[in-house]
Structure formats: structure tokens, C-alpha cells
Amino acid sequence: MLWKLTDNIKYEDCEDRHDGTSNGTARLPQLGTVGQSPYTSAPPLSHTPNADFQPPYFPPPYQPIYPQSQDPYSHVNDPYSLNPLHAQPQPQHPGWPGQRQSQESGLLHTHRGLPHQLSGLDPRRDYRRHEDLLHGPHGLGSGLGDLPIHSLPHAIEDVPHVEDPGINIPDQTVIKKGPVSLSKSNSNAVSAIPINKDNLFGGVVNPNEVFCSVPGRLSLLSSTSKYKVTVAEVQRRLSSPECLNASLLGGVLRRAKSKNGGRSLREKLDKIGLNLPAGRRKAANVTLLTSLVEGEAVHLARDFGYVCETEFPAKAVAEFLNRQHSDPNEQVARKNMLLATKQICKEFTDLLAQDRSPLGNSRPNPILEPGIQSCLTHFNLISHGFGSPAVCAAVTALQNYLTEALKAMDKMYLSNNPNSHTDNSAKSSDKEEKHRK
């Protein structure tokens, strides 16, 4: 007791010297108060929070804990407030520096709960969790270090489900539904991710896949039909012999003109593995057939063939032309010419019937020799499937004319030689009688 009194006297002497007063009268009231209640003013074990308080055991890299009096969220109920459950540190509920306790609970448990509070708010435990994730036994250091920053929370959430061979990236990330195996080396962490090139980076796409649908140009407004354009057809339009550029291809596909229309079309073609360089020049002359897609061109050829078959006036043309050659001396020679022409037309149509040019989704096996087949293919690529059927329809109309011309020639021959018919009938009757005998 005397030792404490002497200490207080020394403190008072220091204060008097600092204030410039050396009389002892000022110390007497304080000595009485110290003797009565020596621990009422400021006990040495109490840690009242103030602005100069800094925990001495924090390492330099981490920020010190801010005083509780400066907490703007002190009125909010803190789920990590001090209670008997926090007597031991809880590793599964680490406290962050922004989550502070209220001033009232801190004052009530200042002497007893401050060490546990500091251990719960220690940011080293939070950083240690990230270090375990990046350098844990699963070898995730290289993988998570190379992943994008927005995918890091998803990877952290999936760590409890991670197996040693690899992890599965969730659907919310950029890489969709692809197993990702992260290696242990930083150099090949990204290269070890298998990615579906058909969906992300382009590549070989099914040629029969529909690229887009194009409305017809030749149909009426009351019966507008759309034609499906496949990837193979787009590839044919970009290849020889047409070699369309972005502007012409956009017109064929009926794409609206825009400022970046060519760029968007090239990007869409890159996704299906087709390259359309900028500034490309067309290789063939532009015709009305250039604006047609294959479906509409074939439809046009079929309708043209139907009209030629049903509406072409073959009989009237044959009768008109035969009247110009009514001389009996020319009829035999003309008939032979008609028969020879009909045979030539038949050979020509038979050749076109064996054409196996690629059209639409068909990939027929070639029948003709490569030399003649390549020429027919070139013609069909220029006309987009309209050429060969249209030529066959025209030649069929010519054959119908030849047939009607031969019939008219026979009628003219019989009308000019009426006795020949009776002579032929008599000869045939004589042969039948001999055969009966």
C-alpha cells in the first residue's frame, strides 16, 4: 500500500513539474482519494478503445483494427458478436475487418472477450484460407491462378467437390459443360482445358446444317415461301466459280444493309469454319441467277419444265413447219433428218440425266467421267441448280416437236400417195394367206 502511495506521489511530482507548480498543497486531496479508491479512475488491466490503440501482435503487412468508436455499422446486429460460443475460435466463421461489434457489447466484454474478438477478426485467417486454396494438396494453384477473376468465386465454391484428377467448371462460366483438368504447372494450365472448338472457336461444321432461311424473290406476296440455306450451299457460293464477296453474299441471303453488316457476316461465317476475307473481289459476272439461292433456282427449273411439258405448242409448230416442206421429193429426206435429230436429242438428254453435281444436301456418287462431270458441275454452280434441269426441259420440248413433226410427215405422205396404202394392205393379206397354208 505504501508502495502504491509513493508511486502516486511520484506521478503527482511529475505533473507538478510539468505544470510549473512545486507546492505540495495540490497533492494532498489526490492522496486522500487514492487511498480511498485506488482503482476507480483507470484500472491498469482495462483496455478502453481509443484512436491510438494498435494490437502489438499484428504483422506489418496487415492493417490494424480500427477503433470501435469509428465503426459506422455499430448499430447493426452483428452475427459475430461476443457470446459464450466464441470462447473458442471458430474457423468456419471468420470475421472480416469490416464487420465490427457494437460499442456496448465491446465495453461489457472488454476485459474478458477482447482476445477472442481479436482472434475472430484476425485477417490472417481469411488470407490463410485463400492460400490453402491456391496451394492446397489438390494442385489448384496453377489452375485458379490462371483462371479469369470473375470465375474465381465459382471455383472457390466448388472446391469441396473437387477431386484430384480435375474439376468441373460450372455452367455460369464462359466454358460451357466441358470437363476441365487443371495441371500442376503454370505453363500448361490453360492449355490443359479441353474446349469444344465447334461451339467456341469454329471448325468443321455439319454441311447439312441450316445456316439461315431466305425468303423467295420470285414468289407473289400472297404465297411467299422461304428457302433453307445450308452451310454447304454457303461454302459453294464462296468458292469457285462465283467467289462472292461479303456484299454480294449479304444480298443473296437477304441481309439488311448496315454499317457493320460485312463484319458481322464474316464473324458468323467464322463460327461455322468459313473464311471470307475483307476486300475480296468476285470472280464471275453477276446475273439475275446470282440473286437466287439453290432452293429457289431448282423450284424455278421445275416450274419451267412443267410449263414446257404441258404448254409448249409442239403440234402446231410441227404442222406449220411441215407445210413449208410439202414437196414429195423432200419428204423422205426430211423424215430422215427428223429421226436423226431425235436420236441426237435423246443422247443429249441421257447425258444430262447422268449429271451428279452437288446440290442442296445431296452428295451423289459420280457416274460420268471426271472431265465431263467437272464441266457440268461448273455450269450448275454458276446457275445454282437451274441450268441442267432447264436445258433438259427445253430439249424435251424439242423432242415433243420432233415427234409431232414425224406424225405430220406421215400424214402428208399418205395424203400425197393414197394408192400406197391399198397396195400395202393387199401385200399383207397375201402374206397372211401363205402363212396359213
UniProtKB/Swiss-Prot annotation:
Residues 414-427 have a biased composition (Polar residues). Its main location: nucleus. Induction: During retinoic acid-mediated differentiation and by nerve growth factor (NGF). Inhibited by the antidepressants, citalopram and imipramin. A motif (PPxY motif) lies at residues 57-62. It comes from the Eukaryota. One of its GO terms (molecular function) is DNA-binding transcription repressor activity, RNA polymerase II-specific. Residues 428-437 have a biased composition (Basic and acidic residues). GO terms for biological process: anterior neuropore closure; basement membrane organization; bone morphogenesis; cell population proliferation; cellular response to iron ion; cornea development in camera-type eye; embryonic body morphogenesis; embryonic camera-type eye morphogenesis. Sumoylated on Lys-10; which inhibits transcriptional activity. InterPro entries: TF_AP2 (IPR004979), TF_AP2_alpha_N (IPR008121), TF_AP2_C (IPR013854). In the brain, highly expressed in the hippocampus, hypothalamus and cerebral cortex. The antidepressants, citalopram, imipramin and lithium-chloride decrease the DNA-binding activity. Sequence-specific DNA-binding protein that interacts with inducible viral and cellular enhancer elements to regulate transcription of selected genes. AP-2 factors bind to the consensus sequence 5'-GCCNNNGGC-3' and activate genes involved in a large spectrum of important biological functions including proper eye, face, body wall, limb and neural tube development. They also suppress a number of genes including MCAM/MUC18, C/EBP alpha and c-Myc. AP-2-alpha is the only AP-2 protein required for early morphogenesis of the lens vesicle. Belongs to the AP-2 family. Binds DNA as a dimer. Can form homodimers or heterodimers with other AP-2 family members. Interacts with WWOX. Interacts with CITED4. Interacts with UBE2I. Interacts with RALBP1 in a complex also containing EPN1 and NUMB during interphase and mitosis. Interacts with KCTD1; this interaction represses transcription activation. Interacts (via C-terminus) with CITED2 (via C-terminus); the interaction stimulates TFAP2A-transcriptional activation. Interacts (via N-terminus) with EP300 (via N-terminus); the interaction requires CITED2. This is Transcription factor AP-2-alpha. The gene is Tfap2a.
